[in-house]
Amino acid sequence: MEIIKDLPEVFEEFAEQRQKSFLAVKQLKDKGIPVIGSYCTYFPKEIAMAMGAATVSLCSTSDETIPAAEKDLPRNLCPLIKSSYGFAKTDKCPFFYFSDVVVGETTCDGKKKMYEYMGEFKEVFIMELPQSQKAEVLDLWKAEILRFKEYLEKKFEVTITEEQVREAVKLENEVRTSLKNLYGVMRHDPAPIKGHDLFRVLYGSGFKLDRTLIADEVDALTAKIEKEYAEGKREDKKPRILITGCPIGGATEKIIDAVENNGGIVVTFENCSGAKSIDRLIDEDAEDIYQAIAERYLSIGCSVMT
């Protein structure tokens, strides 16, 4: 696959992917395809993908719905949680509206309370995430993944086979590898592209409901960036900044702009919408694929585990 468009146009298309998928998710529902929504990178999407479901990240990146959320939740609660709950409560997130089930996880206390309230108007499946990454809790997390599999089988009256799970693992590994190779271009100094353009691809790819298309598109983009870099098209040499912490998107993209409008360049997103979600792969050849899935997800770096 070769990209014939200019890079700015490609970056803009990824930036618009979330809005494009509003219509796409309705079309999936009309076809009878299950939609599974989630808020966290600990969500083992391969299990849902194995049964042919579409997985989608739910809205939580604007302060627009916080006033509605504060009618139920404490005002001093994390704004990310209030935004998530507000979008859900007001039906302003099409992805939430069309989700057959929302998968929650026991990370922080605020999200636990959010899911409790959310369960009053939406079906929510809670995965009990161990608050540790010690080896002895791995069996507990594997059991939760199997419980999630059994829940999906019962709810949607399907059988999820090991072969289907392995196929989903292979597909998602390809997506992660492609995205990892993409942000690897930022090793160049000076950088080949702006950090905000990199972010648009990382963030927008999460809203592409057909996961089979992502790897080829991103690989082609990476090749084009490298080609243009070799031809001398690159940013000026600038201070290189790493962003870590909570997810970024929507209103919080102003953090990227604050850096890049003042002489710096963001070269890495070491957070939930960046490296944390794509750095580690699942061992496709593992004898016990569910154990491999559990190991991969439990090894994600998150402050809730410390």
Which residues does each PLM region occupy?
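A charged, amphipathic alpha-helical module
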Residues: 1-34, 146, 150-281
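Metallocofactor- and cofactor-centric catalytic cores in central/energy metabolism, strongly enriched
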Residues: 9, 15-29, 33-41, 45-46, ...
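Gly/Ser/Thr-rich loops at beta-strand to alpha-helix junctions
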Residues: 37-46, 105-111, 245-250
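Redox- and metal-dependent alpha/beta enzyme cores, enriched for Fe-S-associated oxidoreductases
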Residues: 47-61, 68-69, 246-306
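Short, surface-exposed amphipathic charged segments that create phosphate/polyanion-binding patches used
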Residues: 73, 139-147, 281-287
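Glycine-rich, highly charged phosphate/nucleotide-binding loops
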Residues: 75-92, 302-306
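A polyampholytic, Gly/Pro-enriched intrinsically disordered region
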Residues: 79-85, 144-153, 286-297
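Acidic/His-rich segments in extracytoplasmic proteins that coordinate ligands and/or metal ions
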Residues: 85-154
